[in-house]
Amino acid sequence: MKTGKIIKVSGPLVVAEGMDEANIYDVCKVGEKGLIGEIIEMRGDKASIQVYEETSGIGPGDPVVTTGEPLSVELGPGLIESMFDGIQRPLDAFMEAAKSSFLTRGVSVPSLNREKKWDFKPTAKVGDDVKSGTVIGTVQETPVVEQRIMIPIGIEGKIKEIKAGSFTVTETIAIVETEKGDREVQLMQKWPVRKGRPYSAKINPVEPMLTGQRVIDTFFPVAKGGAAAIPGPFGAGKTVTQHQIAKWGDAEIVVYVGCGERGNEMTDVVNEFPELIDPKTGESLMKRTVLIANTSNMPVAAREASIYTGITIAEYFRDMGYSVSIMADSTSRWAEALREMSGRLEEMPGDEGYPAYLGSRLADYYERAGKVECLGNDGRIGSITAIGAVSPPGGDISEPVSQSTLRIVKVFWGLDAQLAYQRHFPTINWLTSYSLYADTIDKWMNGNVAENWGALRLEAMTILQDEAQLQEIVRLVGIDALSEKDRLKLDVAKSIREDYLQQNGFHEIDTYTSLKKQYKMLNLILGYRKEAERALEAGVYLNDILAMEDLKDRIARSKYIHEDDLEKMDQIVVDLKNAIDNLINKGGVANA
């Protein structure tokens, strides 16, 4: 370990000399308190160090010691249900060590609990050939998550010894005989955060990640292994949308990174998730969640590390064969941290002061998402779905972070302040949003949900787009200028908007909608259009059709029908057909 000397302090940036033996991205202990920092630039024997803790009180002449290791995370049992800061210090152990409710400088705590014992059940036996990524046993970490203990990257050989029983994360569970001698394997392994974990092959994502949010699953789906962005102005509901996806998304593991956002938003997650029950497992949602809290009142530099820490933990669970979703809230704050460090390093600024390499850094992050065939000999398939919130100042998505993100991701959920003011949630604007996975996922839906799913989705989307054009005419010359067919189209579009797209995240039934129910709801609304058009062709007045208040009310309330009572929707379809038949036969208002 080489000791250097500080010659300059500029906020979170410290420059030290005498560091000629250090490497870029090495972790350093800065000052007498041993603050954690990372070398981000080397010039001769001078190192520029990004410090992840408050640097007040540090000055020229103070020592800097390099550890010779890059910033790494500890991967093993104990990750699930934990809450870490941006450099993977567990906040509960941090509080005990610091004896304070506030983040204290210079406190060093291990990321994974060194005392807790975990029950290890071997699945491999002595004499088995193993290589990087081979699963040699399991640990039941929570009732929902089984950790598959893998051979660390870079080890290949024969198992010489393997033990069953209770072990801490640092105790040896197996010995592998390699060409370079015996290698010990523990429950825990380390991995540098800036380097993506390797895999056998990348696979094209075709299966949707279901979220239970109708506007997402039906119109703008994201594939398992895809990448999505949620840009929107303040108060448009980015965080609530991410919370909903984290709660109800059908990923097996959720990594939630609160990066530079308000502390009370992380508090909401910590308070809500343990009480919410996962509809698939019947267990608390917290039993499959890893939280990384790096809120706006924590040091700016640590924001950059928090995103990498999160994606590395996600890759570890992906390598086990799980489907993982990672929420980053918000990547704009992370980009602001990059901008601050770039300014302190006196680099040439790009657009709006952001560094010229902003686009490539964002791409590095999103490209670590994807569906892959994992290392090992059993052909496991794992995926990471990355969902990043973007907070453009004033909601202007022409700024660099939004534009760089949109060039990379394939799904854009554009949040609209106008919809938020109208109390329409989720505030995803159906005219500006898009999903490049929609055609691929339609094929999956047609095969797994209903043959005409894609056709229904297209019909509903066309109606919503036509509505926007018809609204222009109505604003200019009034609704009376429209034909009856167009007025009916406006009525159906209103039903799609208010009864289908709008969803109450706080209602116990409406907060989550299965694919089967989504199909039945959409089929019901578009079935109403089909029947109403049949009546118009038979000469029934539009006002008589619109006067069927009771039936329209039942269609609107179908979103509150329980998942176990979906046959009630089939009854509404029958009643609707009968009511239209009555109208055609009588030529008057149906007594529905």
Swiss-Prot record:
GO molecular function, one term: proton-transporting ATPase activity, rotational mechanism
EC annotation from Swiss-Prot or TrEMBL: 7.1.2.2
GO biological process annotation, one example: proton motive force-driven plasma membrane ATP synthesis
Keywords: ATP synthesis, ATP-binding, Hydrogen ion transport, Ion transport, Nucleotide-binding, Translocase, Transport
Catalysed reaction, written as an equation: ATP + H2O + 4 H(+)(in) = ADP + phosphate + 5 H(+)(out)
Family: Belongs to the ATPase alpha/beta chains family.
Record's function text: Produces ATP from ADP in the presence of a proton gradient across the membrane. The V-type alpha chain is a catalytic subunit.
PANTHER family for this protein: H(+)-TRANSPORTING TWO-SECTOR ATPASE, V-TYPE PROTON ATPASE CATALYTIC SUBUNIT A
Protein name: V-type ATP synthase alpha chain
Provenance organism: Clostridium botulinum (strain Eklund 17B / Type B)
Gene name per UniProt: atpA
